[in-house]
Amino acid sequence: MRHPLVKNAEDRMNKAVEKISEELRKMRTGRPSPAILEEIKVDYYGAQTPISQLATVNITEDRALIIKPWDRSVLSSIEKAIFASDLGLTPQNDGNVIRLTFPTPTTEQRQKWAKKAKEIAEQGKIAIRNIRRDILKELKGDTKDGKISEDDEKRIEKEIQDLTDKKILEIDKLLEKKEKEIMEV
């Protein structure tokens, strides 16, 4: 049976990996993805509403996203929200839909995005190591208090280290996949 500290560490590490995965997924790459619009909120009748709740977002073959709101009165609000975001894209409003064209990124831009992806991954690794440190500190306290034998402490330490290594490897794989996606022309 797994020790509760190992279970706690695994739950916390899984959440950290999921958060990093989500951050990387939302990052802009050279190709259009509806995920980059998830953080943009539109003022809709006084409420900050995600674009995905106001419109359908489709990808076209020519490196563009088409945003088609269900209520055309919200077109200008969506356009303003995209302008105000830090995406660096210029929305084109034709009265029915908003078109976001993704220019082919320069090598310099791709390198900048890859660097940002590495920073995000490194934050995730630091979070994993901090979780390990906290759990091991708790484990040492339990051993000192006599709740856990020294043999069990060593076994649990090894389990936590193996778990840490596994989660850091997961983050490395997520980063590798994202870097490949970024550098693809």
From Swiss-Prot:
Q: Name one GO molecular function term.
A: ribosomal large subunit binding
Keyword annotations from UniProtKB, A to Z: Cytoplasm, Protein biosynthesis
Q: What is the top-level taxon of the source organism?
A: Bacteria
Q: Per the UniProt entry, what is one GO biological process?
A: translational termination
Mainly localized where? cytoplasm
Q: Name one Pfam family in it.
A: RRF
State the signal peptide span.
none
Q: Which GO terms describe its cellular component?
A: cytoplasm
Cellular compartment(s):
Cytoplasm
Q: Which residues form a coiled coil?
A: none
Per the similarity annotation, which family is this? Belongs to the RRF family.
Role played: Responsible for the release of ribosomes from messenger RNA at the termination of protein biosynthesis. May increase the efficiency of translation by recycling ribosomes from one round of translation to another.
What NCBIfam families does the record tag this protein with?
frr
- This chain's protein is named Ribosome-recycling factor
What is the organism field in this record?
A: Pseudothermotoga lettingae (strain ATCC BAA-301 / DSM 14385 / NBRC 107922 / TMO)
Q: Mind giving the lineage of the organism this protein is from?
A: Bacteria, Thermotogati, Thermotogota, Thermotogae, Thermotogales
Gene for this chain? frr
